Design a protein with these regions (language model features):
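Interfacial/capping segments of alpha-helical transmembrane domains
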Residues: 54-102, 384-424
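Short cytoplasmic-facing helical segments at TM-TM junctions of multi-pass membrane proteins
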Residues: 241-287, 557-605, 629
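Individual transmembrane alpha-helix segments
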Residues: 88-135, 419-451
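Glycine-rich helix-loop "coupling/hinge" segments at transmembrane-helix boundaries
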Residues: 220, 249, 292-335, 351, ...
Length: 674
């Protein structure tokens, strides 16, 4: 690129040397906060006017004309067909899937005796339980040992061993592959800004897409079954690993790196022996997220033929066998809690150090005990078959007592739940849905542009209007508005419960810790689990779907409210006390205003959780984007599924952008950030 000589040699005035160049002209006018606020108010007023004047508006402003709908789905289908058939990508994906299938055959053979290579006898359930107990003891003492071993004892006694091992055989393969891929991409993003710029928007969209959007392309390129479940699990679980790896490497103190350089370490040695070990905590948090995401997706992958606990739970829910469903649900919850606690303990565990001369046995005592247990239990299982496998006829079951208890409970609460359901459907949900569908498309777009302009200027307005406008262009506006009404009502209820609950819990340290522990536990549950109680209470309708969304979205609202209030600087609270403020005055005038940025992050997370859950809740009879996504999955319509998934992602990204910009500005005004 050439430079004009007169510009290159022109002297720079000393007063302007080093000064930051600021935008001038139209850009400066658009970025002016006062003017941006005024423009935003004008656009919001225009949106209200469009709503009032709807009967006189041209049809194009009321609904995007069908003739102008862009056939994104057809274009994507043609692209996928071209990639699959003309470029021969199908053969490549099937070849790659065969390698994963080979790994799955090994784990399936070892865990539940599937007749595949290496054709060995399955590991006895007692040996698996002992392994989990030893691992728990090594990571966190007797409590984790009891949790690990007890979980697998429960699974065996309930006769659910094969279904559980079908699920675990996929997790055992998917988690290491997702961790390795995420670690490699995270390191690549850290080393290259160009790679990070490419990956960052992809990760934003990937983490906003609902679960089902991942499944359809995998079914087209891979097929159905365990290998598809493993691949979709890997794809779904990789993004948090990339982000946590990047975060950890960026937070490595420079003085540690300088120490390595002074010792003559090469760039690879610095990465391998200095940076990655220093970022160990963040990387292991990423591993924890991969494990939990994998369990959530493996359960949902039953929709594409993945055998295991998810498939069994799906069958039982479809036949409304509540007692058996609760048994399977308890198993999934125990697995989730066990995997979460073990992986968190691993992330927090510090390497053990021994004095010079310590014997090998003393350093590896638990490993020796585990090996002896494995050999002993394997030999004992040859003599006592019940230690190898507990068949269904020898298994315990609490499904009949549970059914009896549930029947008695529902007999008592049915009049109440029926009244609640009838009131909500007749007086709240149907009018609210009709109101959302009545809104003109032009008014909604103008309102989004006005709010975004007021919050973040013209760039935010352009971004958010582009997101929402893409939904209108896709032709799925009405379904998106139904999704929006369900999510907004669920978020409102979750906020009305979660915010006061968080405020109440934050007033006492012990109470806050107990509520946060409950939030941690609930957050480990795969989202599918929340459908069991709501189907039991409300049946199959919008009320049940919204109830599941509310419970699922309650956790982040409560958690971030507590964290926000606990994060208020103590000197501010002391100043309020010295001024004679009561506890209520301190809460309303000091604590809550300072906690608002953190609470808004909780609101943002509640919206994202609700969007994910409302798509899953389509299984119990909604008429939103989730229902269409399930239809696309059943017909393997890749284009339609991706377009619907992007519509959901754009809704989430719009809310995320607005809340993020507002929260950042609020933090700046409060002096929390520069």
């Amino acid at each position: 690129m050439s430079v004009r000589p007169d510009i290159a040699t022109r002297p720079v005035h000393p007063a302007t040397r080093g000064a930051v160049r600021r935008p001038t002209g139209l850009v400066a006018a658009l970025n002016d906060p006062a003017r941006a606020s005024a423009i935003g108010l004008v656009l919001i007023g225009l949106a209200i006017a469009l709503v009032v004047l709807k009967p006189w508006l041209p049809e194009a402003l009321v609904r995007w004309p069908a003739a102008l709908v862009v056939p994104f789905a057809d274009a994507l289908n043609r692209l996928f067909l071209f990639v699959k058939d003309d470029l021969g990508f199908l053969a490549v994906t099937r070849a790659g899937a065969s390698g994963i299938e080979w790994l799955l055959d090994i784990t399936a053979n070892l865990l539940y005796g599937k007749r595949r290579w290496p054709n060995l006898e399955p590991i006895p359930w007692s040996a698996v339980a002992a392994t989990a107990a030893c691992l728990g003891w090594w990571l966190g003492g007797w409590r984790l040992a009891l949790l690990g071993g007890g979980t697998f004892v429960w699974v065996a006694l309930m006769g659910q061993w094969k279904w559980t091992m079908e699920t675990m055989s996929v997790i055992v393969v998917a988690v290491p592959l997702a961790v390795g891929l995420g670690l490699a991409l995270g390191v690549a993003s850290w080393k290259s800004r160009r790679v990070e710029r490419v990956l960052s928007p992809m990760l934003n969209i990937a983490q906003s897409l609902p679960h089902f959007a991942y499944m359809i392309p995998v079914v087209v390129f891979i097929g159905v079954g365990p290998k598809s479940g493993a691949i979709v699990t890997i794809i779904f679980a990789v993004p948090p690993m990339i982000r946590m790896t990047l975060l950890g490497l960026r937070q490595v103190p420079p003085e540690i790196v300088e120490s390595g350089e002074m010792c003559g370490a090469t760039r690879w040695q610095l990465l391998r022996h200095v940076r990655v070990p220093t970022a160990r905590r963040e990387i292991l948090v990423g591993v924890n997220q991969v494990i939990m995401q994998s369990l959530a997706m493996v359960v949902l992958a039953s929709f594409i033929g993945m055998p295991g606990l998810g498939q069994k739970l799906l069958q039982l829910l479809q036949s409304l066998k509540i007692g058996r469903s609760i048994e399977i649900g308890i198993t999934i919850v125990l697995l989730a809690i066990m995997l979460d606690r073990l992986s968190k303990a691993w992330a927090q565990r510090q390497p053990a150090h021994f004095s010079r001369g310590t014997s090998w046995f003393a350093r590896h005592r638990l490993l020796v005990i585990w090996a002896l247990l494995m050999v002993g239990l394997y030999l004992l299982a040859q003599v006592v078959p019940l230690l190898a496998e507990i068949s269904r006829k020898h298994a315990f079951s609490v499904s009949k007592p549970l059914d009896a208890v549930m029947d008695a409970f529902l007999t008592v609460v049915d009049p109440v739940t029926l009244a609640i359901r009838s009131f909500l459907i007749r007086d709240v949900l149907i009018p609210m849905r009709d109101a959302y569908l009545w809104l003109p498309t032009g008014a909604v777009l103008t309102l989004v542009a006005g709010v975004a302009w007021r919050v973040g200027g013209w760039r935010s307005a352009l971004t958010c209007t582009g997101f929402v406008g893409s939904i209108a262009l896709s032709g799925w506006w009405d379904r998106a508005m139904i999704t929006a009404y369900m999510v907004s009502f669920a978020v409102l209820l979750a906020s009305l419960v979660g915010l006061p609950l968080g405020v109440w819990a934050a007033r006492d340290e012990g109470r806050a810790n107990r509520v946060l522990l409950a939030c941690d536990t609930m957050q480990t549950f795969p989202s599918f689990i929340y459908l069991i109680p709501v189907i039991m209470l409300f049946g199959v309708n919008d009320v049940a779907a919204i109830a599941a969304v509310v419970v699922f979205g309650l956790v982040p609202m409560t958690r971030y409210t507590i964290e926000g209030l606990r994060g208020v600087p103590p000197q501010l609270l002391e100043a309020a006390d010295m001024s004679g403020a009561t506890r209520r005055q301190t809460l309303w005038n000091v604590s809550l205003p300072m906690a608002v940025p953190t609470i808004m992050i909780g609101l943002n997370q509640t919206v994202m959780f609700s969007l994910f859950m409302v798509i899953i809740a389509a299984f119990i009879g909604t008429q939103d984007l989730g229902q269409e996504m399930q239809r696309a999955l059943s017909s393997t319509d890749v284009g339609k599924g991706l377009v619907l998934g992007l519509c959901v992602a754009f809704m989430g990204l719009t809310v995320d952008h607005l809340i993020g910009r507002w929260g950042a500005e609020r933090s700046r005004l409060l002096g929390l950030t520069s």
